[in-house]
Amino acid sequence: MLHLIFKSPIATAILERIAAGDEVVFLENAVLRLLHKGSFSDVLAQLLVQNRLYVLAEDLEVRGISADELTNGIEVIDYAGLVDLTVSNPAILSWS
């Protein structure tokens, strides 16, 4: 399953619905939670054990965040990568 998370803060209820093996893309203001020095970094580290996490490059750029500032293990993708993920995942949940 693919989860698209759009806003910050990210509710605990959303995180509880992410199963092992799911893929998660952070978009829009949700990218603000991905900083390696942020308060959310421990939660991200736990998710990364069983899930692949992605962030849209354009959303980082708009907010002045570089890939070097992200929690290790988060993959930066472009719109083509997002399309590939939507095609490869039969079920998609959008959280906004």
Model-based region annotation:
Residues 4, 8-24:
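Histidine-anchored nucleotide/phosphate-binding helix
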Residues 4-8, 50, 84-85, 93-94:
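Active-site-adjacent betaalpha module
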Residues 5-8, 28, 57-58, 96:
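Structural motif
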Residues 17-20, 43-50:
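Short, conserved loop/helix-junction motifs that constitute active-site signature segments
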Residues 23-34:
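A short beta-strand-loop structural module common to alpha/beta enzyme folds
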Residues 38-42:
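Charged helix-capping and loop-helix junction motifs
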Residues 54-55, 59-65:
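Conserved phosphate/oxyanion-binding catalytic-loop motifs
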Residues 66-96:
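C-terminal structural segments of small proteins and small subunits
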